[in-house]
């Protein structure tokens, strides 16, 4: 009886292991990267808003916790002024889903359909004290 002894280099063993597990790794989706709230704000909001100055829409610094319709120097719609809304993450989320549905008669019409994008924008705004 003849026995054969196979000797493999460490590099060959590492390569074989990597190839053996490659299909397992390929089947796993990488976790999604966190969305960049600042970039989404710039893309979706900055045409009409800024953090520190009123534009077409009111400034946003300090929006979380503020009552709607109170930024000095901005001409709010009567509907938004009378709404009594306090901007929380929850009310901002509802607002961004459809401002006119939340406050009929408001000036704002732009929506953010994607819930993850809304959450990222709201998270960004919450940090802008």
What feature does the model see in each segment?
Residues 1-4:
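Positively charged n-region of N-terminal signal peptides that target proteins for export
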Residues 34-38, 50, 54-89, 110-112:
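Gly/Gly-Pro-rich "capping" loops immediately C-terminal to redox-active cysteine motifs
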Residues 9-22:
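Bacterial N-terminal signal peptides
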Residues 21-42:
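Electrostatic cytochrome c docking/interface patches
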Residues 14, 34-35, 102:
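Hydrophobic alpha-helical segments
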Residues 41-51, 121:
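The canonical Cys-X-X-Cys-His
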Residues 88-129:
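C-terminal capping alpha-helices of c-type cytochrome domains
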